[in-house]
């Protein structure tokens, strides 16, 4: 009887320790993802602020003591930013030829894409889904018709509205049926079960300078 009680006690202690370890790992993962999301948003915001054009103030030359220069942080070579307010997404993207334009590192501008300033062109961007660090498009499937997607590029905010959210077979080819008389944005990622490709088709509705 005593041995049986000791065994049960050990089982309870071990079980409690395993539960605490599991909870700690889960909490650490969520905290890491939260701060990674904040860092991504900050990088995108830094890029948008850095490329804003402002009229330089008139300065009067005067002698000053030399100041120690603070190193300026790079803008990560982004050429633009994708913003999707309904899923709290904001992320910079790179030139097609940039080594960081890679779906395993970032969202990826697909080959033969046009930039938003090309009338009736098509900009296609892919990203991973799932739960990893680079699963930037994990919530893409939640987008609905008329949801807004903004592209910040070359000092202009291009405003798109979602026209379709659909799935196609995952075979390396994305069938895009669109109105060729409209400037188009396509965002794509894997479906939750990885057997299909989620495709978001959006059309340009407005653009404003910033």
Where are each of the predicted segments found?
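Solvent-exposed, non-transmembrane regions of membrane-associated and secreted proteins
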Residues: 6-210
């Amino acid at each position: 009887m005593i041995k049986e009680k000791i065994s049960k006690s050990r089982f309870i202690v071990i079980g409690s320790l395993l539960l605490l370890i599991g909870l700690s790992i889960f909490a650490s993962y969520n905290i890491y993802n939260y701060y990674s999301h904040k860092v991504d948003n900050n990088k995108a915001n830094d890029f948008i602020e850095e490329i804003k054009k402002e009229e330089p103030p008139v300065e009067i030359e005067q002698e000053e003591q030399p100041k120690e220069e603070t190193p300026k942080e790079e803008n990560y070579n982004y050429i633009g930013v994708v913003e999707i307010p309904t899923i709290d997404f904001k992320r910079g993207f790179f030139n097609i030829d940039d080594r960081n334009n890679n779906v395993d590192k970032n969202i990826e501008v697909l080959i033969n894409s046009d930039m938003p300033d090309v009338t009736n062109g098509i900009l296609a961007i892919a990203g991973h889904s799932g739960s990893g660090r680079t699963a930037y498009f994990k919530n893409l499937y939640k987008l609905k018709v008329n949801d807004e997607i903004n592209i910040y590029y070359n000092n202009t905010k291009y405003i798109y509205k979602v026209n379709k959210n659909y799935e196609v077979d995952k075979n390396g080819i994305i069938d895009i049926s669109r109105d060729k008389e409209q400037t188009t944005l396509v965002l794509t990622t894997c479906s939750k079960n990885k057997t299909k490709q989620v495709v978001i088709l959006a059309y340009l509705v407005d653009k404003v300078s910033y």
